[in-house]
Structure formats: structure tokens, C-alpha cells
């Protein structure tokens, strides 16, 4: 199902993270780039305070190096790579404010959204000029041309996806594991679509997340930080844009969507009733407070991600 170049991309990015991370972790500790844990979070997370963060820098390094290795043969890799780096830069600034300037919430929400929309609009404007404004809708099994609505609609979806991935990054191995599965499926879809450039880029993400899991699985010795989560969110949706499959990526990334919607519902319901739907949002914290072990929550969410990917595959095969 995967061609040799995609497999090589997975292996290369995996090895880069596996080799570089043990060098970077002590350096992050030396710089005191430790995770700031909020007091209103689950009590079991308080012991994670000080765990090195910004490990997403190594994920980014692996994706960049792997992409550059294959760039000459697969030049279309450049487009999602630029989006990935741009969103990673926002995450880096956010992390820097948290861990160095000691402002636990990082960039203000408005600041973050403005930067995210600027990147999304710029990226999508350029893509529209080169690839057009048509997108595939699996529900009606046809391409539709969004025309003038392409940039605004897709920008909203891109920013939503980026922040949904960010919200998913709350448990050891959760965001990295889910993104590894999603990226693997995107690699397969890319090959079926004969888009080998996106297969390679997806493979680079698969390998980097796989390597990162070695250090991020419970009990994590490093976190990706917003550097990693915003970067991965941007990369996932950028691939979807290149494949003209934004709806499909929302299906395979269904776990991200559920996490984000749980936060939106919690906030809205609390404002209206002063009561909460969940014990805590995002949803993974709700299950923690119900007494589920952290590793159990992560594995169950991985399984649901696989099911979402199978649902997407069924939609493709049955032309739903």
C-alpha cells in the first residue's frame, strides 16, 4: 500500500527523532524549558510540572530534513512544508512566552487567532491560484468549486483544525499517537490518489510522530508543546488542502473535532446555565476525572481514530 519512497520517508524521520531527542531533552532541562501545569487541571497532572516541553522542535526538524531530502523529486512538498513551519513558529512563540516569560497561558487567544488566520489566508490564497478552488465532497461524490468562498471557508476550517489538534495534546502520547494514525491514513489516500508528493510528506509526519512517541508515551519524558501541536495541526490540514479533501480529513480527524467541540459545548453551556456538561474539558480530562487511567484514555482514543479512518475509507469505497 505504501511505496518505497514513502516508507523511506517514515524511516528517515523516525530515526532523526530517535537520535536527536536524547540530545535535546537534557538541553531543554538545562534551559529550564519545563511544562507549566495549570492549577485548575487534573491533580494527577501536577507531577508533570517541569517536564521538558517544546519537543515539537525535533518533530519539526525531522519533517523539514526529510522533506528537503525528497524535495527535488517531489517539489510539491514545499507548499505544506511552509504552512507547517509557519504554524510551528506560532507555537514556538506561544511556548517561549509560557516557559521563558512565565506567562502560563502563552499568547493571548486573540493574538494567536490573528496569526493563524494570517497564515491560513496567505497559504490558501496561493494554493487557490495554483490548484483552483474546487474541493471534493464525499457525501455527494463530486467536486464543487467554492470560487470566492474558498479562502474564507477553508481558512476557518484550517484554524479550527489547528486548534483542535492543540486541544487534543493534553495526555501523554495522545496527540502524537492520533496524528501518527491520521498521517498514515493520509499517506495511503495520497498514494491511491497518485499524489506521491503528499504521500512523502505524510510519511515524514508518521515517522516523526512515531519516533516522538518513544519519549512521549506514558510516562512522558518530554512534551511537544504548542510548537508541535500547532505545527502538526497545520500540516494535517495543509495536506488535506493539497489533496482537495478537507471534508475527508475532518472525518479521519474526528477525534480532534470531538475534543474541540467538547470545549465549545462546555463553555457555551456554562455561560448559559452556570453548570457544566463534562467534569472537565477537553473530553480526555472528563474521562480522567471519571477515574480512567491516563494510558487507558489514550489507547481508547487511538482506537476511535482508527475507526474514524476506516469510516473515511468506507466513504471512499462506497462513494458516500
From Swiss-Prot:
Protein's pathway: Cell wall biogenesis; peptidoglycan biosynthesis
GO BP annotation list: cell division; cell wall organization; peptidoglycan biosynthetic process; regulation of cell shape
Topology relative to the membrane: Multi-pass membrane protein
Listed transmembrane segments: 7-27, 50-70, 77-97, 113-133, 148-168, 173-193, 198-216, 221-241, 247-267, 297-317
Substrates-to-products reaction catalysed: UDP-N-acetyl-alpha-D-muramoyl-L-alanyl-gamma-D-glutamyl-meso-2,6-diaminopimeloyl-D-alanyl-D-alanine + di-trans,octa-cis-undecaprenyl phosphate = di-trans,octa-cis-undecaprenyl diphospho-N-acetyl-alpha-D-muramoyl-L-alanyl-D-glutamyl-meso-2,6-diaminopimeloyl-D-alanyl-D-alanine + UMP
Localisation: Cell membrane
Enzyme class, first EC level, given as a word: transferase
Predominant cellular place of this UniProt entry's protein: membrane
Cofactor (UniProt): Mg(2+)
Keyword Transmembrane tagged: yes
Molecular function as annotated in GO: metal ion binding; phospho-N-acetylmuramoyl-pentapeptide-transferase activity; UDP-N-acetylmuramoyl-L-alanyl-D-glutamyl-meso-2,6-diaminopimelyl-D-alanyl-D-alanine:undecaprenyl-phosphate transferase activity
Keywords, sorted A to Z: Cell cycle, Cell division, Cell membrane, Cell shape, Cell wall biogenesis/degradation, Magnesium, Membrane, Metal-binding, Peptidoglycan synthesis, Transferase, Transmembrane, Transmembrane helix
Signal peptide span: none
InterPro entries noted in UniProt: Glycosyl_transferase_4 (IPR000715), PNAcMuramoyl-5peptid_Trfase (IPR003524), PNAcMuramoyl-5peptid_Trfase_CS (IPR018480)
EC assignment: 2.7.8.13
Gene Ontology CC annotation, any one: plasma membrane
Biological role stated in the UniProt entry: Catalyzes the initial step of the lipid cycle reactions in the biosynthesis of the cell wall peptidoglycan: transfers peptidoglycan precursor phospho-MurNAc-pentapeptide from UDP-MurNAc-pentapeptide onto the lipid carrier undecaprenyl phosphate, yielding undecaprenyl-pyrophosphoryl-MurNAc-pentapeptide, known as lipid I.
Family: Belongs to the glycosyltransferase 4 family. MraY subfamily.
Name of the protein described by the UniProt record: Phospho-N-acetylmuramoyl-pentapeptide-transferase
Organism of origin: Caldicellulosiruptor bescii (strain ATCC BAA-1888 / DSM 6725 / KCTC 15123 / Z-1320) (Anaerocellum thermophilum)
Gene that encodes the chain: mraY
Amino acid at each position: 500500500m505504501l511505496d518505497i519512497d514513502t516508507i523511506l520517508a517514515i524511516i528517515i524521520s523516525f530515526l532523526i527523532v530517535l537520535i536527536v531527542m536524547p540530545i535535546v531533552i537534557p538541553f531543554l532541562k538545562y534551559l529550564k524549558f519545563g511544562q507549566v501545569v495549570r492549577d485548575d487541571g487534573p491533580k494527577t497532572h501536577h507531577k508533570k510540572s517541569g517536564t521538558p516541553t517544546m519537543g515539537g522542535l525535533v518533530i519539526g526538524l525531522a519533517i523539514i530534513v526529510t522533506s528537503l531530502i525528497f524535495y527535488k523529486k517531489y517539489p510539491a512538498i514545499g507548499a505544506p512544508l511552509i504552512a507547517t513551519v509557519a504554524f510551528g513558529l506560532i507555537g514556538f512563540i506561544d511556548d517561549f512566552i509560557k516557559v521563558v516569560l512565565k506567562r502560563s497561558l502563552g499568547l493571548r487567544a486573540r493574538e494567536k487567532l490573528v496569526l493563524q488566520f494570517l497564515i491560513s489566508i496567505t497559504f490558501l490564497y496561493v494554493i487557490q491560484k495554483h490548484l483552483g478552488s474546487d474541493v471534493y465532497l464525499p457525501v455527494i461524490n463530486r467536486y464543487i468549486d467554492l470560487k470566492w468562498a474558498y479562502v474564507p471557508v477553508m481558512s476557518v476550517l484550517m484554524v479550527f483544525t489547528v486548534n483542535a489538534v492543540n486541544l487534543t495534546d493534553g495526555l501523554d502520547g495522545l496527540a502524537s499517537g492520533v496524528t501518527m494514525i491520521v498521517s498514515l491514513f493520509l499517506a495511503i489516500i495520497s498514494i491511491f490518489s497518485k499524489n506521491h508528493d503528499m504521500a512523502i510528506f505524510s510519511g515524514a509526519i508518521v515517522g516523526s510522530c512515531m519516533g516522538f512517541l518513544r519519549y512521549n508515551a506514558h510516562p512522558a519524558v518530554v512534551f511537544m508543546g504548542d510548537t508541535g501541536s500547532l505545527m502538526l495541526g497545520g500540516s494535517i490540514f495543509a495536506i488535506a488542502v493539497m489533496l482537495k479533501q478537507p471534508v475527508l480529513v475532518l472525518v479521519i480527524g474526528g477525534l480532534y473535532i470531538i475534543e474541540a467541540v467538547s470545549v465549545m459545548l462546555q463553555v457555551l453551556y456554562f455561560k448559559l446555565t452556570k453548570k457544566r456538561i463534562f467534569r472537565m474539558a477537553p473530553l480526555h480530562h472528563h474521562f480522567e476525572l471519571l477515574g480512567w487511567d491516563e494510558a487507558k484514555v489514550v489507547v481508547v482514543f487511538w482506537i476511535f481514530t482508527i475507526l474514524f479512518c476506516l469510516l473515511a475509507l468506507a466513504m471512499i469505497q462506497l462513494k458516500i
